[in-house]
Design a protein with these regions (language model features):
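Positively charged n-region of N-terminal signal peptides that target proteins for export
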Residues: 1-4
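Cleavable N-terminal signal peptides
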Residues: 6-7, 17-18
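Residue-level hotspots at or immediately adjacent to binding/recognition sites across diverse folds
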Residues: 19-214
Length: 214
């Protein structure tokens, strides 16, 4: 049983809490849900693709993943595949200011007002993979390969920011009037506005893959 728990924790990623519902996604199209975080139920996703990000907004769950995969669900139980218009690997999705935004490889950025119809946007960073995404204080922030940080007030027009690092940034979040991003070699950067970033001492040289707050 110990080995089984280890496997699940590795394969099933991205578990945000939405009210009384948990939704977790991962390898081979796996989606599981729980009302209390204790008892979990496997759902039928209709795909075998790796699923990476999951978010909730405007009454809809949205998950993204390999080969341009986007799935939506009103309740976390029944899922519908949507047309993304890309075959790129998608690596993060969030909801803010009435808009869903997903990001991925080669600077891919897609937006949708309803989670169903998606539009590709110009990131200006096509040579780099994007891996993390958040929304806070009226700003979308995405991070990725080679220290890439992009910001947008509307999800449509994006501006590249100076991170001061070339490491792969893996995750980003916003809370308490600050953005925080983490990545390889124990990298942690913080910013009050998404524009100016400061390196912080993490105390580890191991890769950091995710960050959150309450």
């Amino acid at each position: 049983m110990k080995h089984l728990l280890i496997i699940i924790s590795i394969l099933l990623l991205s578990s945000p809490i939405f009210g009384q519902s948990f939704v977790s996604v991962g390898n081979s199209g796996n989606i599981i849900t729980s009302s209390d975080g204790i008892s979990w139920t496997k759902r039928t996703s209709g795909t075998r693709e790796y699923l990476k990000g999951v978010t909730y907004g405007n009454g809809l769950f949205v998950t993204d993943g390999n080969s341009g995969t986007i799935l939506t669900s009103p309740d976390g139980n029944s899922w519908t595949k949507r047309t993304s218009g890309t075959s790129k690997y998608l690596r993060g999705v969030t909801y803010g200011n009435g808009l869903f935004v997903t990001v991925g490889w080669n600077g891919t950025i897609l937006t949708s007002s309803d989670g169903i119809s998606w539009t590709q946007r110009t990131s200006g960073s096509q040579q780099f993979h994007l891996n993390g995404l958040t929304y806070g204080n009226g700003l979308f922030v995405t991070v990725g390969e080679s220290g890439t940080i992009l910001t947008s007030p509307d999800g449509i027009t994006w501006t590249e920011r100076t991170s001061g690092t070339w490491v792969y940034l893996r995750g980003v979040t916003y809370a308490s009037s600050a953005f925080v991003t983490v990545g390889k070699s124990g990298t942690i950067l913080t910013s009050p506005d998404g524009t100016t970033w400061t390196s912080r001492t993490s105390g580890t040289s191991n890769e950091l893959r995710g960050v959150t707050s309450r």
